[in-house]
Amino acid sequence: MNIHISALIQKMEEELKKAKTAERDEELKRYVAVVRSLCDVVLDQPENASAPRIQPSVTPSPAAPPSTDQLMMEKMMGSAGLNKYRKQEKEKQEEDGNGESLFDF
């Protein structure tokens, strides 16, 4: 799926406006993460792509329904950007030992 860069830049500007008015740090970080992911999408797009790439859709695990944040991120970034964001969050979570297991110290 080819997304026009001007549409991505417009989304970045919207998220920056939201970030400027964020009242809590976690809100601010969420908006900045969306902007970062949109930047990654722009940088990862091939310059001379003749055929659109087909990306698999993200299927949430049945144990945990997707939160509104995840749905918003998927809508804004597409499935590839959301997967990249989730991977970064998982790596960050494992770094400091605050994983889902009781035995993570």
Swiss-Prot record:
Region Disordered, residue ranges: 47-105
InterPro entries (UniProt xref): DUF5327 (IPR035218)
Origin superkingdom: Bacteria
Gene induction: Negatively regulated by TnrA under nitrogen-limited conditions.
Bias (Basic and acidic residues): 86-95
Protein name, entry field: Uncharacterized protein YwdI
Organism: Bacillus subtilis (strain 168)
